[in-house]
């Protein structure tokens, strides 16, 4: 398909092949939107954005190698003219707050009608912000994330099953420092251990 001169150039990032294909097919039905690349992980998405400089990146929030949140934060600095829309199956207020803090211009649930995604692409391209209304209301009333960025990094890895030794090596910290951060996170969340703390934080959208 040949893109019209005024077409909005979009890159899609989604690790589920069927969902990726469906999103691409739906957006390609729009006469003013062209999908110029499809990627299955965050690193490939970042590479594609760097190479193709799209108008809009539509990305899943949970991605291998680099999450949608990490992508949005990176692009805000390195490619400010590419606007990010995050799609998610998780109606968690904490995710929305983190997405907006990362610089995402749109945040939608995957179960919304296809026409809403196309409209969101257009509005974000014009410089507007698009947020699912129900999620916006929940986020306004939700409790604030008490975790620091470092606590979040460490707790996420602990929740994935990494040991303190592995986390320390990966983040270039001492094991004692890792344990201190974990203790702080556990206390803030009122959890019984690191696994429980990670579960609580994920439920609230803080990881």
Where are the regions that the model predicts?
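Receiver (REC) domain active-site loop signature in two-component systems and cognate sites
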Residues: 63
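Acidic catalytic/metal-coordinating carboxylates
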Residues: 41-44, 67-71
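Short, flexible helix-to-coil linker/hinge segments that flank and couple to helix-turn-helix
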Residues: 94-153, 206
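Active-site beta3 strand of CheY-like receiver
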Residues: 52-58
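Short hydrophobic/Thr-rich beta-strand motif most characteristic of the beta2 strand and flanking loop
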Residues: 32-40, 48, 191
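Active-site residues of response regulator receiver
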Residues: 60, 88
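Recognition helix of helix-turn-helix DNA-binding domains
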Residues: 163-196
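Conserved acidic segment of CheY-like receiver
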Residues: 6-19, 23-27
